[in-house]
Amino acid sequence: MESSTSTSNGTGARGAVKAGPTRRRSDRTAGTLVLIGGACEPTGEALGAFLRQCKALDGGRIVGITTASQDPAGSARDWLKSFAEAGATHVEIPIVDRRDQAQDRRIAKMIEGADGIFFGGGDQVHLVATVGGSRVDRAVREAYANGATICGTSAGAAALTETILAGGEPDEYGQMQDLHLGPGFGLLGFRAMIDTHFTQRRRLQRLFMVIAQNPETLGLGIDEDTALVVQGHLGEVVGRGSVTFVDGRGVRFDNADECMDGKPLTLSYLRVGIVGSGYTLNLRERELEVLVQARQEEAAGVSELEVLRSEGMEG
């Protein structure tokens, strides 16, 4: 097993790494997902959300997976520097760039004992093809079930959904070809699909196209250096940008099947929302949590109603 590691004294080493025992967490029954739209700053709020969740600044162990990168070892070295800059000292990144490495029991054991597991960016299709269904994949799921925090940035975030999106970058007219849809790791449910670098790479049209073709899917477009922190069915937005959500269940007309031949997209009654930093998206209801709560309070008759009246007017 080839690996790249950092330790508490900041030095690196190559070779087999001995993993600690698996830690079962009794404070919660499932972990947290931190989904970052790419290009996260080492000391920014998006990556900071992951470090806080897995208590990395207080000795929590992080295991990184850089399989999505064209150069997993180079990416591992870069991430070790970024995590060190952020203040995380217990970070291990085993090099997994082939299927046989994803079946390595030593790497799986390392992952099972981690407080946080980090998926770097690159090619989400390659990541899922290499790791999906392997011992590493099963170890990630086991750790998540026991309360570990799973973080992905860019392709690493896109791969955590049930269905992944790749390719099909729009041209200046919003037209595209060669869209790829395939199975992901499925840790994020709710029939959600993630697109990253969303505002920065003008991917709104691409997400519209995919949702038009798959109207039951919930599209999530995450900006760079921005995270959607998901616990249960609630996702809080943290960082510099926003998260766009797209719900196609109410669409009345679209010509999505014609668009792959170069025709412009025509679409009506698509539901779109933008969630800024500090606000929470209810993934189950596909709505801002503040509005879900308001509806529930109104239905229960407990919502407050403030009315100012002119003097002498009876209430």
Where would I find each of the regions flagged by the language model?
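C-terminal and late-domain segments of enzyme folds
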Residues: 2-58, 70-85, 166, 170-315
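General beta-strand structural signal in soluble alpha/beta enzymes
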Residues: 35, 92-94, 118-119, 150-153, ...
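Catalytic-core regions built around general acid/base machinery
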Residues: 53, 109-113, 133-147
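Short internal beta-strands
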Residues: 61-67
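Portal/gating segments that form or line small-molecule/metal binding sites
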Residues: 69-113, 119, 126
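Catalytic nucleophile loop
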Residues: 118-121, 140-164
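Glycine/threonine-rich flexible loop motifs
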Residues: 124-134
